[in-house]
């Protein structure tokens, strides 16, 4: 069977998916183990009817709304492939900017103790631990299920880390030179306009927060300096609508901070120090 014949099948099932031709190519690549070059040149695919039936079954799952990354159990993030499933959020490209800024600042330096809160898949913490000289890495999350995914990814990339089930700092001990956090920050009223695939498939616990999405962020800002060394840094992601509110909270706390924008020129994360 030729690639184009298989692609016709895929496009039929993916007709209501945005960028369906691109996804059809990804399905063929990931299911049959072909390169995009093989797909472009319409290579022959050696496959049984059983394999075609399984392929169609996965297409049907995608057509029902399940995110592609949960079907094939991975997401590319900062030049690495992370395992993901329904226990964790799918990493977003904007979060790579936080990782990149942190790497730019700490490249060539040694970090004694590093904490990644709300770690989810571990994509932030494991990326930084892979790129930087960090002596001690702690990945923490309120969800035991999320920590299992983070453990799997840490094993894949040979990262030695401590894993702690913790509601923010509830089970955290000691001070850290670097803290990163990508907390639940989506305002609850955004539920009615978010993509249905996000609402139905991604863990809502890791997405939404009360008080215009600021409830967990406010708690973190109140507590973080007790766990940060004098010259330590915090990098925190937030919703594009929250820049002014976060600036006000940090000005009241009298800490140094700088807000950074994402690819769409929207406020997206903050770098801040202690008191």
Regions found by a protein language model. Name each.
Residues 27, 65, 95, 124, ...:
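Residue-level signal for inorganic ion chemistry
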Residues 97-193, 197:
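Conserved SAM/SAH cofactor-binding pocket of Class I
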Residues 1-32, 39-40:
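Non-catalytic accessory regions of SAM-dependent methyltransferases
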Residues 185-216:
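Mobile active-site "lid"/loop adjacent to the S-adenosyl-L-methionine
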């Amino acid at each position: 069977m030729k690639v184009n014949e298989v692609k016709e099948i895929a496009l039929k099932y993916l007709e209501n998916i945005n960028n369906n031709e691109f996804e059809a190519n990804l399905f063929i690549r990931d299911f049959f183990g072909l390169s995009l070059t093989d797909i472009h040149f319409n290579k022959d695919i050696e496959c049984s009817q059983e394999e075609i039936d399984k392929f169609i079954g996965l297409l049907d799952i995608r057509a029902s709304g399940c995110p592609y990354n949960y079907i094939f159990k991975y997401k590319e993030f900062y030049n690495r492939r992370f395992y993901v499933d329904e226990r964790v959020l799918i990493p977003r490209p904007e979060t790579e900017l936080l990782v990149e800024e942190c790497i730019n600042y700490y490249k060539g330096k040694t970090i004694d103790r590093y904490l990644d809160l709300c770690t989810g898949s571990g994509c932030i913490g494991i990326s930084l631990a892979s790129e930087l000289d960090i002596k001690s890495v702690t990945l923490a999350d309120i969800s035991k299920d999320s920590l299992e995914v983070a453990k799997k990814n840490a094993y894949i990339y040979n990262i030695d880390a401590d894993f702690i089930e913790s509601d923010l700092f509830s089970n955290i001990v000691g001070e850290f030179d670097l803290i990163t956090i990508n907390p639940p920050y989506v305002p609850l009223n955004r539920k009615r306009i978010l993509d249905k695939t996000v609402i139905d498939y991604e863990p809502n616990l890791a997405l939404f927060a009360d008080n215009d999405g600021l409830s967990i962020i406010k708690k973190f800002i109140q507590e973080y300096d007790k766990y940060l060394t004098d010259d330590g840094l915090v990098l925190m992601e937030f919703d594009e609508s929250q820049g002014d509110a976060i600036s006000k909270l940090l000005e009241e706390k009298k800490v140094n901070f700088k807000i950074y924008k994402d690819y769409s020129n929207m406020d997206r994360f903050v770098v801040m120090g202690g008191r």
